[in-house]
Amino acid sequence: MTDKNPQMERISQVFGADEIPRVAGKTLHIYFEYLKERLDCPCLLTGIESIRFFGWEERFEFGYGSQAEYERLRRQEGSYKDKYELKEFDATVDEEWDILVKVQRIPYRKRFEIPLSQLQAVDKSSGNYQLLNDYTVWYVNWR
């Protein structure tokens, strides 16, 4: 095995291989099972940035639209700035998209199904933070 940084080592170990495989249906299922066994739930999550699922927010970040419109859409759509509770790892593997997790927004209690690669654990010192960060790094860089 070549010298890898610790994160690359952890990702390789998910698949039991020297080389990190590309994101595909089979590898998404492998990662899903890995996370299902290791994530501690409930877990408090938040979005990473205003792209993909949270892409509606991008224009507001650049100064377009009113604050009232932003707040209205935020209640309806969910924001990457919101906090979400993952009560259990109730997820679906969408081979074309991502691992989709069912979360409940705090405080409004609205439920969403959000791509896991768009979320991170709020507690950066937790094992969940590392697990989810490793998944996102793999998902973004091996697609």
Model-derived regions: residue spans:
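Intrinsically disordered, low-complexity terminal/linker regions enriched in Pro/Ser/Gly
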Residues: T136-V140
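Basic/aromatic-rich interaction segments and small domains that mediate binding to polyanionic partners
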Residues: M1-F54, E61-L131, W142
